[in-house]
């Protein structure tokens, strides 16, 4: 039996199901291959809004949507084998679940059951996501985030994360007070709740106005930095991703630096968290970030190790960071030369990534004192 694919899963450019969804700074999601080709062709506007993009547009992985897409084949196979009336029944079923969730007389056990089933429904159906939002259930979900019951808190955060997949909900959730709850969870929640809360911040931060709101909210950034320092692998990865999303907004870079993040990010990068290198690649654009990086002992060695063993994105950012630091310090130039970076850069001449080739060329010119030709 045939079934309809959710439009949310299709790239607006290729119209194909996305295999690696990424979020453009305009807030819209595209398949990485398609939007990268758009950017590499010299386009500096959003394909949908036509609004201008920065010279080097940031592409933020949409982990939540990717997870939904990966699960979709399994779910859709089960759904397609059901009678159409049963699929339609899920919509009427969702209304009963919403009623239970918002009812003041419902027990925690009843609310947990409703949340669990709504999370499952909203994962794959944008119309149900809109229905939940329009019904006023967001307030009830936010109240559950305040609960001392960790399971109830985790399910309510998961529901809010699913709702945030709708672009129209991103600003609305912030207006409803979700940031305060997220910050509290980042401070005192369970490990799973902290990871989901950080992922929710990433989803909300794809909207420019939310970047500013989140960044200026007391303790929001410091809570992420703290999670990066003491969290488990999942928590650290999600906190670094959230910081990356927030730091695409220039005013947030100083805030992140002022929270003492640079040594923590360097340590994370040294332990293999390459998302931390990407955050440093944004922080190096502000003066305070460069000053803090120059103070961290062994930082150049960490970046050189990424050049030798990292993925393409990590190499790209490491080259960029080294060039920024070398432009400001002769001592760092000498250290970078001693680490054999000139030779490493020559090895990138035939790299598949145009950005890596360009960054390597620029760094070599900086290290050798050769002006770049216009």
From Swiss-Prot:
Which keywords accompany this UniProt record?
Answer: Repeat, Transferase, Ubl conjugation pathway
Effect on the protein of changing residue 58 to S: In strain: cv. C24 and cv. Cvi-0
* Listed result of changing residue 91 to Q: In strain: cv. Cvi-0
Name any one GO molecular function: ubiquitin-protein transferase activity
Keyword Transferase set for record: yes
Q: Which organism is it from?
A: Arabidopsis thaliana
Task: Name the job this protein performs.
Answer: Functions as an E3 ubiquitin ligase. Involved in the age-dependent pseudo-self-compatibility process.
Give me the disulphide-bonded residues: none
Q: Which tissues show it?
A: Expressed in the whole plant.
> Mind telling me which InterPro entries this protein's record contains?
ARM-like, ARM-type_fold, Armadillo, RING-Ubox_PUB, Ubox_domain, Znf_RING/FYVE/PHD
- Whereabouts are the ARM repeats? 126-165, 167-206, 208-248, 250-288, 289-327
Catalytic reaction equation(s)? S-ubiquitinyl-[E2 ubiquitin-conjugating enzyme]-L-cysteine + [acceptor protein]-L-lysine = [E2 ubiquitin-conjugating enzyme]-L-cysteine + N(6)-ubiquitinyl-[acceptor protein]-L-lysine
The main enzyme category here is transferase
Q: Where is the U-box domain?
A: 4-79
Fetch the Pfam families from UniProt: U-box
Q: What is its EC number?
A: 2.3.2.27
Q: What is this protein called?
A: U-box domain-containing protein 8
Is the keyword Disulfide bond in the record?
Answer: no
Annotated pathway, please?
Protein modification; protein ubiquitination
Q: Return one Gene Ontology term, BP aspect.
A: protein ubiquitination
Effect noted on mutating residue 311 to S: In strain: cv. Cvi-0
Record gene name: PUB8
Name the reported effect of residue 184 to A. In strain: cv. C24 and cv. Cvi-0
Task: Cite the effect that the entry attributes to residue 366 to N.
Answer: In strain: cv. C24 and cv. Cvi-0
Tell me the PANTHER family matching this sequence: U BOX DOMAIN-CONTAINING (PTHR23315), U-BOX DOMAIN-CONTAINING PROTEIN 8 (PTHR23315:SF112)
**SUPFAM superfamilies membership:** ARM repeat, RING/U-box
Q: Out of the domains of life, which is the source?
A: Eukaryota
